[in-house]
Amino acid sequence: KENLFNVLTNYLDFEDGVSALDLFSGTGSISIELVSRGCDKVISVEKDPQHHAFICQVMKEVKTDKCIPIRGDVFRFIERCHEQFDFIFADPPYALPNLEEIPSLIFKHGLLKEDGIFVLEHGKDNHFEDDPHFMEHRHYGSVNFTLFRATATADEPPTL
């Protein structure tokens, strides 16, 4: 995680009014990291009720209102969300059948602001180099991250 955030600081200043979305947030470690790095707003989406409750409890303990935990299905959230974010992180289960659709859904629904960064954590067998928004791929041990960027030339406005 530390290595990833070191890379991300080349692209984003988390203390400069950044809004973030943490998808498949699990126990909320990325959401907590984003709040601690100065994000103005973090929406944390997790389906599991125990994980969601844990995130709520941690945010209460650290006395922050900068994280908004949402319990729900990530794909439904993506379809219904009308906000845009500077930074999106997704850590879906590696065996998720439609994992490879996540980047196109993020861009189709216009969730990322222009020049925003989307990071997808995934297994070694997923490849996204042909995606028009692909920036770079990083791997740290068995963990793989692909970074995507929203650019004005590559993006189509979301269809309603």
Model-derived features with residue positions:
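Class I S-adenosyl-L-methionine-dependent methyltransferase catalytic core
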Residues: K1-L160
